[in-house]
Amino acid sequence: MLNVPSQSFPAPSSQQRVAAIGRSKVPLKPGRSLMDWIRLTKSGKDLTGLKGRLIDVTEEELAQHNKKEDCWICIRGMVYNITPYMEYHPGGEEELMKAAGRDGTDLFDQVHRWVNYESMLKECLIGRMAIKHVSISKEVTSVENKMNKHLNGSVASSKMSRTSSKESHPWYDWFQTESLVTVAVYTKMKNVCSELVIVDHLENVLRGEIIIGDYSYLLHSELSHPVQKDIEVKVSATAGKIEIKMKKKEPVSWKSLGQPMDGHNSFLKHSQRGLYYRKCRLASKTDINYNTKLFCVQLPQGCHLQVPVGHHIYLKMNISGVDIVKPYTPVASCLLPDAQYSTFCNKQCLYLMIKIYPNGSITPHLENLTVGDYISISNPQGTFSSFQIENVMDVFLVAAGTGITPMIRLLQHVLTCVSSLRKAKLIFFNKKEEDILWKEQVEELSLADKRFEAQLILSEPSVKWTGYRGQISYSLLNESILRTEEGSKILICICGPNAFVDQGISFLQDLGFSKEEVFAFRE
């Protein structure tokens, strides 16, 4: 029997409920809470209308189910009948109908980022979207198989059939020596970077995903023979080539790379892939201030994962029978540049700055974790591109509270790697002085690098505070955001609670900054 907690979920003052302020919410009927939905999904009732069958759904068929009484949506390539969920949605039927009969991935990412839709809607799953993705044949002809024998296990991928309407797409070869197996992926794209390559080797299953613009190429295979846990990933940026090297446990000759698994050799829209999680070990947990901690999370052996600047990961925990997910942007263990190279560049660790909410849906559980416990972390997600800071001269980072997290590595990156930079300014809003995260380090950095300036603003300062006071406003931003020279390339990033971000964007638009000059990170 489901053990239902007495308090509502999420808790009344949790960040999830607070974050919903500003979105349209409707009163739910009695018996239509999240916990009531969980009870319904566990009741055994057929919520799909297909009596347990899973089907492939075409775009045309999906579009036909676009009514309140018959509503299907697609989320990351999977199709759900959300008709029975309509009355349980806190945003109301109108919000869900925005994605009726079409792809609702963006809608769920915006409104339900804190809930794992795969768990919440698993009893509503109808099947997989029959996506017209770029795929490479899993099988080669018998003639090609004969050729492979002369290639020492190399898959003659160049001869594989291609069903792509695209002019170019990735393909792969593999080859072996007595002690080593190498998988080579050819992306046909220059300037491939290591951060766009995610590889996991777990229990003799190799999963490699390469992000190419809005698309994703996936290798997914159960290997023919055991290999050592640790893998090596080499990226040749100019050639657009990626090599995954694995050491054999036994010096035997492989006849094939292995058994293809779900999604192997596919090339499709990144948004259509489900999030992939791996279990990571909590290595340390330290206090930053009275309510915020720095978590150091160790990636498992055989995992190659580097989070691009400005991107986040999802952290997942199972709470009261529901998989709760929450986005967090990795930071460095210290704001100062010297520490960046000694800590964050340990590619097997991620650092997460997390504010603990006593009545939050997930952070109290994170606070109770001890060193050695495991949590699940997803592949990186995000839309920020490093091209946005190429040749930039002025960077302004507008943050409120833990909205500073995406700014930390971005600040380090522009100060270290952008030669055109003339000015980087952090405009940091908090309530009280004790809320200012890494205050001493911010001040040290401003002394260490003359290009960096910090403007600390408090809305509820003590009488001893001599700095800036107030809240985000048109006049404050007008006085604080000034180009170093007329016509200089500028980037303004903003992050914080939704209301803060919405206000800030409105003020910046009124000040005449273009959409290309403003980027919003959403908490």
Curated annotation (Swiss-Prot):
GO cellular component annotations of the record: endoplasmic reticulum
Protein location: Endoplasmic reticulum
UniProt domain FAD-binding FR-type: residue ranges: 275-387
Binding site for heme: H89, H112
Xref: Pfam families: CS, Cyt-b5, FAD_binding_6, NAD_binding_1
Enzyme nomenclature, EC number: 1.6.2.2
Residues of the CS domain: 167-258
Membrane-crossing segments per the record: none
UniProt: FAD binding residues: 367-382, 394-426
GO molecular function (one): metal ion binding
Reactions catalysed: 2 Fe(III)-[cytochrome b5] + NADH = 2 Fe(II)-[cytochrome b5] + NAD(+) + H(+)
SMART domains, per database record: Cyt-b5
Similarity comment text for this entry: Belongs to the flavoprotein pyridine nucleotide cytochrome reductase family.
Protein name (Swiss-Prot/TrEMBL): Cytochrome b5 reductase 4
Organism in which the protein naturally occurs: Xenopus tropicalis (Western clawed frog)
Gene it is expressed from: cyb5r4
